[in-house]
């Protein structure tokens, strides 16, 4: 049985017409699923009982089972722990801004990259999410909170470009006007840097935003923070980003988690400005999550100094305003606690 959320618009039309239903029925089904958040064919009352029975024979509509939810008392940021059909768990986060609601979603169960400051990597890698499981995070959050998500960041558990096909297909579904209907420039992919996939992304014709999780200005330091750097060097990654920018014309966000005594030195700021010179970038400076054992945040003074050095060297930069600090909103924390409690 196929999960309807795995299907593109064109695939759904083909599937239902092959079953003998009219093409326009696809739009009716999608209205129920994406607009009304209905995942039961029996509730689709503008379809005949015969059609509903036929659809139930061939398709499921797999929303996610909510295991846990944490809501920030500070800013309303909401973190969800979901159970998948095979018993694995993933996390998603809903962030509230005055003018929009942003969802941070996962692409893998666990993560193979194992950045030292990330809780997701501590629990290991299990598998890629299906297209439907990625899409279902948006629908399940919207159904749970009864709110419409306007922005999506692929910054949750996992490395999106290591689950490339399912990530790209989910973006097309979320962007399609008869499905997720989320503007393409309101969707961001965050990656630690998979050079060939960054170049491939430039060829997709998808005008999504790209964020690169860099975290260090030299290979020596990045090897320690992001083990995958031993496979793909900073030079290879930035070269791929330059190709991406030539093809798309888009500015790229550079994510930089600052850790006291590791990558927050004045020399690091100067080196970062040097390697990013003449690139169309914006640097997001992120104090390390204090819940990660053994890692400490830089002082406020050091954060401001780091930012000032970048600005003085012509690199746009900002210190990210944190959300959900009281609920450890960074993805991976809830899942890791659940795994530890069962071991």
Curated annotation (Swiss-Prot):
Subcellular location(s) per record: Cytoplasm
Cofactor(s) it depends on: [4Fe-4S] cluster
Keyword match Plastid: no
Which reactions is this enzyme annotated as catalysing? adenosine(2503) in 23S rRNA + 2 reduced [2Fe-2S]-[ferredoxin] + 2 S-adenosyl-L-methionine = 2-methyladenosine(2503) in 23S rRNA + 5'-deoxyadenosine + L-methionine + 2 oxidized [2Fe-2S]-[ferredoxin] + S-adenosyl-L-homocysteine; adenosine(37) in tRNA + 2 reduced [2Fe-2S]-[ferredoxin] + 2 S-adenosyl-L-methionine = 2-methyladenosine(37) in tRNA + 5'-deoxyadenosine + L-methionine + 2 oxidized [2Fe-2S]-[ferredoxin] + S-adenosyl-L-homocysteine
Task: Alphabetically list the UniProt keywords.
Answer: 4Fe-4S, Cytoplasm, Disulfide bond, Iron, Iron-sulfur, Metal-binding, Methyltransferase, rRNA processing, S-adenosyl-L-methionine, Transferase, tRNA processing
> Active site: which residues?
91, 331
Q: Name one GO biological process term.
A: rRNA base methylation
- Cystines in this chain: 104-331
Glycosyltransferase keyword on record? no
Which annotated residues bind S-adenosyl-L-methionine?
158-159, 190, 213-215, 289
* InterPro entries on file: Aldolase_TIM (IPR013785), Elp3/MiaA/NifB-like_rSAM (IPR006638), Methyltransferase_A (IPR040072), RlmN_N (IPR048641), RNA_MTrfase_RlmN (IPR027492), rRNA_lsu_MTrfase_RlmN/Cfr (IPR004383), rSAM (IPR007197)
Q: Which residues bind [4Fe-4S] cluster?
A: 111, 115, 118
* NCBIfam families given in the database record: rRNA_mod_RlmN (TIGR00048)
Under which name does UniProt file this protein?
A: Probable dual-specificity RNA methyltransferase RlmN
Q: What is the lineage of its organism?
A: Bacteria, Thermotogati, Thermotogota, Thermotogae, Thermotogales
């Amino acid at each position: 049985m196929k999960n309807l959320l795995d299907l593109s618009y064109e695939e759904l039309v083909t599937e239902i017409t092959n079953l003998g239903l009219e093409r326009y029925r696809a739009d009716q089904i999608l209205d129920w699923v994406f607009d009304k958040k209905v995942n039961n064919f029996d509730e689709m009352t503008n379809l005949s009982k015969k059609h509903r029975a036929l659809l139930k024979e061939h398709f499921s509509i797999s929303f996610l089972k909510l295991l846990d939810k944490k809501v920030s008392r500070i800013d309303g940021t909401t973190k969800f722990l979901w159970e998948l059909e095979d018993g694995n768990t993933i996390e998603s986060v809903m962030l509230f801004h005055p003018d929009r609601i942003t969802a941070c979603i996962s692409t893998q169960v666990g993560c193979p990259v194992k950045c030292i400051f990330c809780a997701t990597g501590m629990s290991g890698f299990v598998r890629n999410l299906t297209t439907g499981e990625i899409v279902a995070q948006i629908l399940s959050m919207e159904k749970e909170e009864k709110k419409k998500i306007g922005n999506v960041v692929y910054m949750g558990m996992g490395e999106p470009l290591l689950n490339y096909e399912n990530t790209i297909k989910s973006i097309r579904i979320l962007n399609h006007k008869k499905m997720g209907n989320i503007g393409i420039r309101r969707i961001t992919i965050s990656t630690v840097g998979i050079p060939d996939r960054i170049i491939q992304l430039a060829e997709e014709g998808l005008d999504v935003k790209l964020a690169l999780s860099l975290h260090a200005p030299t290979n020596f330091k990045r090897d320690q923070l992001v083990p995958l750097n031993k496979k793909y060097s900073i030079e290879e990654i930035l070269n791929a980003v330059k190709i991406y920018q030539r093809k798309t014309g888009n500015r790229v966000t550079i994510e930089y988690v600052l850790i006291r005594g590791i990558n927050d030195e004045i020399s690091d700021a100067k080196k970062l400005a040097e390697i990013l010179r003449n690139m169309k970038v914006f640097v997001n400076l992120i104090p390390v999550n204090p819940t990660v054992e053994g890692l400490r945040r830089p002082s406020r003074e050091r954060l401001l100094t780091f930012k000032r050095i970048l600005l003085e060297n012509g690199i746009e930069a900002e210190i990210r305003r944190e959300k959900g600090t009281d609920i450890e909103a960074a993805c991976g924390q809830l899942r890791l606690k659940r795994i530890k409690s069962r071991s």
